[in-house]
């Protein structure tokens, strides 16, 4: 069924490498035939088993992402306005289904979600905004903490990066905040979204190596001094 709170269709992609075997043969066959199938006819094809996943898994029955997909009550019907794609493979351009390098795939996104429970820094959200793709992360990532200091408050979507508060006990709250954030982005006009993209790119320029290298040099200098002192 359609989610009435959404004003447009949403393709939610879970691109997380897992214990995969190989690309799905049945899906590859469908993709080979797609050029010879009229678009209208293609929508009438019967769904594949477990239609959301791109690759075979060694541990399909016990994979937590698969279990969550089936347990959350999300409709996998083609009539739904929320569509799910689970890619359990590294995107190196040769995965057998997507066949596109990660950075090319990234630029096709509208919003990237990195709900870190622990991340000393986090380069993936920085890469996202460098390409002008807004993202969401948490205050438990070094990147999220840095963003908050740069904007002077808990960052929100209009800053180019949304930073939510995550603790040991607020998993459900975070999930709801992420859903609300995605819904909010889906309701933006083209002009509003472009402004957020511009904010994301502008923020990424503050995290270049020419600005950060001094911190690495300071850290290495302190490490060498500490090591020399311990050897005396």
Model-identified regions with their sequence ranges:
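Catalytic binding pocket for nucleotide-activated donors in carbohydrate/polymer assembly enzymes
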Residues: 115, 120-198, 202-206
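Conserved, well-structured beta-alpha core segment at the onset of a catalytic domain
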Residues: 1-9, 108, 112, 196-197, ...
